[in-house]
Amino acid sequence: MPRKKPFSVKQKKKQLQDKRERKRGLQDGLRSSSNSRSGSRERREEQTDTSDGESVTHHIRRLNQQPSQGLGPRGYDPNRYRLHFERDSREEVERRKRAAREQVLQPVSAELLELDIREVYQPGSVLDFPRRPPWSYEMSKEQLMSQEERSFQDYLGKIHGAYSSEKLSYFEHNLETWRQLWRVLEMSDIVLLITDIRHPVVNFPPALYEYVTGELGLALVLVLNKVDLAPPALVVAWKHYFHQHYPQLHVVLFTSFPRDPRTPQDPSSVLKKSRRRGRGWTRALGPEQLLRACEAITVGKVDLSSWREKIARDVAGATWGNGSGEEEEEEDGPAVLVEQQTDSAMEPTGPTQERYKDGVVTIGCVGFPNVGKSSLINGLVGRKVVSVSRTPGHTRYFQTYFLTPSVKLCDCPGLIFPSLLPRQLQVLAGIYPIAQIQEPYTAVGYLASRIPVQALLHLRHPEAEDPSAEHPWCAWDICEAWAEKRGYKTAKAARNDVYRAANSLLRLAVDGRLSLCFHPPGYSEQKGTWESHPETTELVVLQGRVGPAGDEEEEEEEELSSSCEEEGEEDRDADEEGEGDEETPTSAPGSSLAGRNPYALLGEDEC
């Protein structure tokens, strides 16, 4: 038996460190030097992804990675549809951190809030989306997959060859997710492109419009979702902007949670959360408009009378219901047939299939992550049938739902198209998972330079001895002041946890409680015209912002005084186990504190 060699404590420590690094997937062995809680969250960079075998994708960050020991018993890979984004270099992250500490924030003018789609996507450039290459039934599955991978690598190579990483926004690098889009477009008779009304230009890729209306010859319906989060005049202005530039579009306004007329319109009530009214999904605004758009497209080729009858029943039920709670609405109504299409994206089915087959119209719902695709389906059905989450990438694969025997809905996973948007704006749009952001401070600075965050949250400058004195603010100061106000401290040193505070501010922005709305070109000059537009008045009445309150249950507002509730929301988002709604602003109904978090009613010392 060989003699045992001495093994020092230092060697043992190094062995354990190497073992932990291997488990975390760190190839370079770098570890964060920070001893704070924020440093522990930022310490990992994702493993280099070379699964596609090309140098174009050698700096890919894989988000929502699930622990897996290989394929499951049925050959299912839980990480097959995870988000793939280009990874920021460590030098770039450190540079942005320094800028967040040093750069003084200056408010921008209203003209800088105007977004032109030609500046974001540059139609006609290489900022396109990957198309499924030509194929034939004589090809095997392996040949088809190999051809698609080569085509996808060429697509990525053209984009990265034309633009530097600093100019490009985050966009999807996972071929499996693009295959889901191909399948949805091939099986759909009508395509719904869902966008967020706060920044619809961000969610509207012109290349998809040209492909759907031109090459496929399908009707495209643009859904401006979450209209309760924007002023009615701005909603009408965006509607006319898209009608003017894309005449083949059918534009529909939608929200799953119409604003209650008794909800105060005070922008300073950021920390107020409204209790959700009962039968919330049946109150969705927009199903009637969507039905009229589909009737104009199908022109009698499909019998949609059952859909109209369903909408009438939902409206009658919402009027009759006494708001007894969400449990009641989950049980009401007929069952909805759900089909999970986990591997259908790999099937070689062409887009030339029969339209309105068997008298059924298939409506495909596509769009960016976190724009409310799943919430829209719940609003159309009238109750919760689709799991929704604030975390982008929650929908892993497309599913089909029969709204009525003649109407089939198809929910596609969210996809990020390549553009030239600032990455900070993408974070504020909810495209990137907030819990996995390496450097959230510049996004906070981007937000604070466009809306008065300090005034809305009543923040006190961390270096101010006199509260009435004026001090210059930087993004780091705002995060530190919010951490002090909320009591966010690091675990060991009890310093202000600025990383957690920055994440909290970004969640408020994504949820709509810190609402940042962008405008179409020329809106600032014509704001008065849009405010007096007849469609604006009609939308105000439709949303229920004016008029009698009605015989509904009273709503209560409770202030977010406990940090435990917000921490619970953060954990649910990070683990992707939360099934909260994608829209939870002040104006939207929200469930009670006790219902959302059993620890929210405890005092600060009991958490």
From Swiss-Prot:
Domain commentary: In contrast to other GTP-binding proteins, this family is characterized by a circular permutation of the GTPase motifs described by a G4-G1-G3 pattern.
Gene from which the chain derives: GNL1
Species for this entry: Homo sapiens (Human)
Biased composition (Acidic residues): 550-584
Annotated segments matching region Disordered: 1-81, 547-607
Family annotation (CDD domains): HSR1_MMR1 (cd01857)
Comp. bias (Basic residues): 1-14
Functional note: Possible regulatory or functional link with the histocompatibility cluster.
The name this protein goes by in its record: Guanine nucleotide-binding protein-like 1
GO terms assigned for molecular function: GTP binding; GTPase activity; structural molecule activity
The keyword GTP-binding is assigned to this record: yes
Residues that bind GTP: 225-228, 367-374, 411-415
Superkingdom per UniProt: Eukaryota
Family according to the record: Belongs to the TRAFAC class YlqF/YawG GTPase family.
InterPro entries cross-referenced by the UniProt entry: G_CP_dom, GNL1-like, GTP-bd, P-loop_NTPase
Example of a GO biological process term: signal transduction
